[in-house]
Swiss-Prot record:
Positions annotated to bind L-ornithine: 166, 230, 234-235
NCBIfam families: orni_carb_tr, PRK00779.1
Positions bound to carbamoyl phosphate: 57-60, 84, 108, 135-138, 269-270, 297
InterPro entries linked to this entry: Asp/Orn_carbamoyltranf_P-bd, Asp/Orn_carbamoylTrfase, Asp/Orn_carbamoylTrfase_sf, Asp_carbamoyltransf_Asp/Orn-bd, Orn/put_carbamltrans, OTCase_ArgI
Family annotation (Pfam families): OTCace (PF00185), OTCace_N (PF02729)
Name of this chain's protein: Ornithine carbamoyltransferase
Function: Reversibly catalyzes the transfer of the carbamoyl group from carbamoyl phosphate (CP) to the N(epsilon) atom of ornithine (ORN) to produce L-citrulline.
Catalytically driven reaction(s): carbamoyl phosphate + L-ornithine = L-citrulline + phosphate + H(+)
Pathway the protein takes part in: Amino-acid degradation; L-arginine degradation via ADI pathway; carbamoyl phosphate from L-arginine: step 2/2
Amino acid sequence: MSTVQVPKLNTKDLLTLEELTKEEIISLIEFAIYLKKNKQEPLLQGKILGLIFDKHSTRTRVSFEAGMVQLGGHGMFLSGKEMQMGRGETVSDTAKVLSQYIDGIMIRTFSHADVEELAKESSIPVINGLTDDHHPCQALADLMTIYEETNTFKGIKLAYVGDGNNVCHSLLLASAKVGMHMTVATPIGYEPNEEIVKKALAIAKETGAEIEILHNPELAVNEADFIYTDVWMSMGQEGEEEKYTLFQPYQINNELVKHAKQTYRFLHCLPAHREEEVTGEIIDGPKSIVFEQAGNRLHAQKALLVSLFKNVEELS
């Protein structure tokens, strides 16, 4: 591996993108692009990553397990329901025990506070694979996808339309960090968390990014380079049928995308519900790069894993 240096990160864990600098993010993306071209780099030979899941997963589980195999290591699936933690063992005790057995933890769960405690009590790296508040690995892959398309973040406008959820939160922090212009359009009452917006705005002041929270989807996508959406019903929210009516004006369809640049690209973190948050014409059309985006989860996470594991080795 002579062409690209492993990024040096000033953190043991990745819980949100707030923990990374712009330079660290760009280094991770460039390293991820290198690993995408050189899939079988045994940089984590013999390392074990524990994968704790309290939520269903396709992309997160497969990309982390495949990534560890390609790096020469092993991903160990740990069902949250089957672990003693599911029967009352404390997060703190679980963290200390796992630190004796394995080299890193990826956790996909509900409570962000639990992930913070797990990281605090672990002597090994902890990666947030998704909580109710944040999805940093997704946002890192999204930035990689945008960077591959444009080779820059300067002057790029990303429009997020839909529910101000965990993906939206991580994209706000990501866009602020790298200096992008991000607009968010949601129905009233479904805006992103106010504290996270404040953090993004504070970061944007330092980086020159522009962050706008709107309720008008046409205004949000006006002259956008990238349009992004997510499902209207997150896991555990199924049955809130009134949301469908409220969110209908926020569907990504041929009429709405007329307001974006002609060269716009469509992004979605998947899984998608066609004819709800996006029409089939858009997600399956020529402007969509959602499967390239999904593929980049693998490469971005591999870059993150190598960087965090190597960082811990150097510190110890």
